[in-house]
């Protein structure tokens, strides 16, 4: 329980810091912290696979992409001094609507099982607790993915192969005019002689 | 599981393996200093053609399993998929025959595009035999990913890059819409398998305002929109002319031939087999009318060949959707006949477009006095154009005749009427080709290079078929009837 509060507080604080941080690089780093804490929360909920995927996808790919973009864009820190309160009404309304929607959704039954009305007297109890055969998410997913859905798994691997080929085809130039980095020459450069001060 | 499934999937497995071996071969040898960086396009092209032909053979010889659900109900094979796959592979093979010479003339040394064409062919095979929403979506995604890359494959041309980017962005939207529809269907029914969906939807009336779930209605609507996007039916056709014009001509040929077969086959499976219901019929009805009208009117203003062919393919999609929106066995049969003849005519036209080149055959006016310089080619092109327009003894007339007949048979008189009117209008721009070839005297006379032998064979076969189809059409009718029965029973 203590762990839960630690994760929640850290996630909320760093979520606020994402918005408040002056330096965009810092705010991306805080975003990564938010993701890490949220995946901790997911582990506490028993969703181990989700936690893993969350880390891999969001931290491993998306946040790093953001970091690259932020570094490339080269934003001056001094230029960002806007009034935060300007965005408060719009953001607040959107946030309130979101909260309301969540409260509407919680405890709702989306799909009625049958359109006809059943009287409850027919129903008898089944003790499901005795029938539970406990598997973790990872085991279940592995079992399904490599047996029942192996075809889909293979087709998705082909999709990744096409993405790979496509990226190479569209970006690699085979002509001689292209400037290319030769790793050996790059490593063999003498650092003393590369930059000189001209008087 | 293993002995049956792998036996039945042997053609697909062979094609994937051959593609990957070709890829490795190309990568290893095109970067080898020892052989002085050879351009492998022609080499890989011939090998790819060979592997497609072997795949046709493997499919055609057939496994001992005629009807089966494969890999845990993810795929199905029956008569419908059997003939569709053979037909698809034949059309891919004809595209590859056309591209052998093209890459050499354009000096486009990208053997990867042949590998990508092979991979997309493979995905289209899966798409034809898909029997599950997830398998269907993955196959469509694999196909479109290959297409985005080969649309942009001519990197030094701005048109090609633009076409690739445009196709990518719009295609991503349509895939998203399709996936959203699939997830709605899954959310409201709990199944993704086509057979189970068909069982759920028998006798289940999907109405928007009725007591039943509107989520299913929305799901079907979204899936239909996604599909219509992919086959360039009218409200969702915006990308087609630009993409068709911008991509390299061989890629345009591939785009307007192969995916039409696979996506229509998949649509038939989804809508006729699984969601058989009058609600989507109105949507296809509307799209069919709109595509026919736009295909006829917008093509008149074009003076570039590829753009005109793009609009003509939009119009033909409209005619094919007539058969689709009937929903009867005759409708499906006429659709299948229609797509078969459409593909043959399109192969023919693109072979001619690729054969005519001084620098590039881009504008229609470049055809001037072709009847003097190359009379045989002129006759071929005019036969195909007459067939596109639907002049009686040719094959194009038969396909249109059966489509309109099916529309009349199910009481959709409006569809048949608009179809006849628009095909009369579209006669104008098809016959304009003939007029330019025979009666116009150009300012500068152009002589075209002689075409290669592969293309001439292709032209001869397709023209022979288009001209003499009316003498002996019964095999095609029997085959398509069997395919239609396979879906409906």
UniProtKB/Swiss-Prot annotation, chain A:
Listed EC numbers: 7.1.1.2
InterPro entries per the UniProt record, alphabetical: NADH_UbQ/plastoQ_OxRdtase_su6, Nuo/plastoQ_OxRdtase_6_NuoJ
Catalytic activity, reaction form: a ubiquinone + NADH + 5 H(+)(in) = a ubiquinol + NAD(+) + 4 H(+)(out)
Keywords: Electron transport, Membrane, Mitochondrion, NAD, Respiratory chain, Translocase, Transmembrane, Transmembrane helix, Transport, Ubiquinone
Primary localization class, coarse: mitochondrion
A Gene Ontology molecular function term of the record: NADH dehydrogenase (ubiquinone) activity
Subcellular location per the Swiss-Prot or TrEMBL entry: Mitochondrion membrane
Keyword Cell membrane among UniProt keywords: no
GO cellular component: mitochondrial membrane
Transmembrane intervals: 1-21, 27-47, 49-69, 87-107, 150-170
Pfam family, one: Oxidored_q3
Gene3D superfamilies in UniProt: NADH-ubiquinone/plastoquinone oxidoreductase chain 6, subunit NuoJ (1.20.120.1200)
Membrane topology: Multi-pass membrane protein
Record family assignment: Belongs to the complex I subunit 6 family.
General function of this protein: Core subunit of the mitochondrial membrane respiratory chain NADH dehydrogenase (Complex I) that is believed to belong to the minimal assembly required for catalysis. Complex I functions in the transfer of electrons from NADH to the respiratory chain. The immediate electron acceptor for the enzyme is believed to be ubiquinone.
PANTHER family named among the record's database cross-references: NADH-UBIQUINONE OXIDOREDUCTASE CHAIN 6
Stated name of the protein: NADH-ubiquinone oxidoreductase chain 6
Curated annotation (Swiss-Prot), chain B:
A matching Pfam family: Proton_antipo_M
GO biological process entries: ATP synthesis coupled electron transport
Reactions it catalyzes: a ubiquinone + NADH + 5 H(+)(in) = a ubiquinol + NAD(+) + 4 H(+)(out)
Membrane topology per record: Multi-pass membrane protein
Transmembrane parts of this sequence: 9-29, 47-67, 80-100, 114-134, 168-188, 216-236, 248-268, 280-300, 309-329, 335-355, 376-396, 401-421, 459-479
GO cellular component: mitochondrial inner membrane
Keyword annotations from UniProtKB, A to Z: Electron transport, Membrane, Mitochondrion, Mitochondrion inner membrane, NAD, Respiratory chain, Translocase, Transmembrane, Transmembrane helix, Transport, Ubiquinone
Main localization (coarse): mitochondrion
GO molecular function, one term: NADH dehydrogenase (ubiquinone) activity
UniProt-annotated location(s): Mitochondrion inner membrane
Top-tier EC class: translocase
Assigned EC number: 7.1.1.2
HAMAP family in the record: NDH1_NuoN_1 (MF_00445)
Family statement drawn from the similarity comment of this UniProt entry: Belongs to the complex I subunit 2 family.
Function in brief: Core subunit of the mitochondrial membrane respiratory chain NADH dehydrogenase (Complex I) that is believed to belong to the minimal assembly required for catalysis. Complex I functions in the transfer of electrons from NADH to the respiratory chain. The immediate electron acceptor for the enzyme is believed to be ubiquinone.
Descriptive protein name: NADH-ubiquinone oxidoreductase chain 2
Organism per entry: Marchantia polymorpha
Record gene name: ND2
């Amino acid at each position: 329980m203590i762990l839960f509060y630690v994760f929640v507080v850290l996630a909320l604080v760093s979520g606020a810091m994402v918005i408040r941080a002056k330096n965009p690089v810092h705010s991306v780093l805080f975003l990564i912290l938010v993701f890490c804490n949220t995946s901790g929360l997911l582990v506490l909920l028993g969703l181990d696979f989700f936690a893993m995927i969350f880390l891999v996808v969001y931290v491993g790919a998306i946040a790093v992409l953001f970091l690259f973009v932020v570094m490339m864009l080269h934003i001056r820190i001094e230029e960002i001094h806007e009034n935060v309160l300007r965005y408060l009404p719009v953001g607040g309304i959107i946030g309130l609507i979101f909260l309301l929607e969540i409260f509407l959704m919680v405890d709702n039954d989306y799909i009625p099982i049958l359109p006809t009305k059943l009287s409850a007297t027919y129903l008898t109890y089944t003790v499901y607790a005795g029938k539970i055969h406990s598997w973790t998410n990872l085991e279940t997913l592995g079992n399904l993915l490599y047996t029942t859905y192996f075809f889909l798994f293979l087709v998705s691997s082909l999709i990744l192969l096409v993405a790979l080929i496509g990226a190479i085809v569209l970006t690699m130039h085979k002509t001689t005019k292209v400037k290319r980095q030769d790793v050996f020459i790059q490593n063999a450069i003498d650092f003393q002689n590369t930059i000189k001060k001209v008087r | 599981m293993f002995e049956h499934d792998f036996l039945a999937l042997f053609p697909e497995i062979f094609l994937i393996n051959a593609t990957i071996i070709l890829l490795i071969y190309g990568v290893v040898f095109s970067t080898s200093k020892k052989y002085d960086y050879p351009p492998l396009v022609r080499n890989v092209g011939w090998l790819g053609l060979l592997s497609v032909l072997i795949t046709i053979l493997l499919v055609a010889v057939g496994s001992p399993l005629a009807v089966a659900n494969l890999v845990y109900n993810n795929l199905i094979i029956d008569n419908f998929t059997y003939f569709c796959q053979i037909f698809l592979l034949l059309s891919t093979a004809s595209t590859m025959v056309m591209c052998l010479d093209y890459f050499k003339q354009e000096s486009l040394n990208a053997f990867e595009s042949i590998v990508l064409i092979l991979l997309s062919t493979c995905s289209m095979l899966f798409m034809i035999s898909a029997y599950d929403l997830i398998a269907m979506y993955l196959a469509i995604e694999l196909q479109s990913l290959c297409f985005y890359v080969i649309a942009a494959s001519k990197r030094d041309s701005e048109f090609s890059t633009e076409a690739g980017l445009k196709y990518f962005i719009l295609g991503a939207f349509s895939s998203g819409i399709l996936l959203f529809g699939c997830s709605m269907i899954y959310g409201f029914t709990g199944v993704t398998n086509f057979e189970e969906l068909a069982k759920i939807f028998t006798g289940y009336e999907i109405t928007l305002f009725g007591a039943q779930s509107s989520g299913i209605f929305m799901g079907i609507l979204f899936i239909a929109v996604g599909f219509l996007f992919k086959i360039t039916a009218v409200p969702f056709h915006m990308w087609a002319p630009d993409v068709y014009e911008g991509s390299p001509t061989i890629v345009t040929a591939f785009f307007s031939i192969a995916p039409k077969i696979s996506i229509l086959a998949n649509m038939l499976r989804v809508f006729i087999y699984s969601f058989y219901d009058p609600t989507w019929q109105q949507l296809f009805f509307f799209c069919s009318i709109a595509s026919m009208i736009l295909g006829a009117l917008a093509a008149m203003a074009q003076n570039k060949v590829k753009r005109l062919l793009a609009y003509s393919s939009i119009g033909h999609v409209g005619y094919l959707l007539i058969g689709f929106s009937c929903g009867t066995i005759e409708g499906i049969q006429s659709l299948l006949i229609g797509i078969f003849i459409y593909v043959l005519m399109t192969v023919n036209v693109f072979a001619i477009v690729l054969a005519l080149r001084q620098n590039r055959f881009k504008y229609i006016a470049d055809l001037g006095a072709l009847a003097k310089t190359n009379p045989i080619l002129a006759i071929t092109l005019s036969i195909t154009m007459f067939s596109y327009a639907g002049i009686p003894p040719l094959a194009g007339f038969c396909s249109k005749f059966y489509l309109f007949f099916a529309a009349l048979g199910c009481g959709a008189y409006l569809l048949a009427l608009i179809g006849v009117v628009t095909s009369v209008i579209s006669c104008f721009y098809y016959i304009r080709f003939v007029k330019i070839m025979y009666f116009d005297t150009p300012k500068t006379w152009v002589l075209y290079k002689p075409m290669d032998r592969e293309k001439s064979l292709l032209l001869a076969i397709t023209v022979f078929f288009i001209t003499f189809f009316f003498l002996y059409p019964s095999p095609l009718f029997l085959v398509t009837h069997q395919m239609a029965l396979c879906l409906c029973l």
